[in-house]
């Protein structure tokens, strides 16, 4: 296997962009608002977002990639506006330092997928996760898999004071479509946040073309949250 765990390709292509972003963050206490970058003509210059395929053919079909276009407009990060499908059990997953994971109904990961997920998150990867339609069966399966993959860690509530709620878009509170207050959960490994999870959903199904999902109790303004999560994952 090629040593792609450290995401050397990502670092090489984005070092200048990341340096600019860090300087912007250190110079401003307010959320980052910068002018859009110039058009990019090479995919090698773009940040990529993986769309995990797992447990056979489960994938994030109903997770909208619309937030990636918002991200490019609201920050100076150069981003591919489309998800890149990638199998969790494939070596190629390590080419994507940020990925989304979603689905419906119950599922079980293979042993290879569990090993890959653990390696991915412990060696530099970041995962944004939510079930389609707030699916309770999927939520239960996901939590079981996290316990198997990371027996020494647990999902914890992310406080609203966390930078993830202010890094680009100010998000003072989270509510579902019924205006009920909700929260995000996160997985930390050695002090590093490597996963953000919403059981209500951040899929932004209104912008997920070709998806028949009802959205369930999806969090309001999911694209703004996703922009923040992606930016945080890149900068921290």
Outline where the language-model segments fall.
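Bacterial N-terminal signal peptides that target proteins for export
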Residues: 2-17
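Bacterial N-terminal signal peptides
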Residues: 14-26
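Aromatic-Pro/Gly-enriched surface loop or interdomain linker
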Residues: 29-98, 104-105, 202-203, 209-236
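Alpha-helical scaffolding within the catalytic cores
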Residues: 34-36, 82-88, 110-116, 179-183
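An acidic, glycine-rich "communication" segment
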Residues: 45-48, 63-64, 136-209, 216-227
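Loop/turn elements at helix/coil->beta-strand transitions in domains of secreted/extracellular proteins
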Residues: 47, 94-98, 123-126, 190-194
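Active-site-proximal beta-strand/loop segments in catalytic clefts of secreted hydrolases
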Residues: 52-55, 101-104, 130-133, 158-160, ...
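Short alpha-beta junction capping motif
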Residues: 98-139
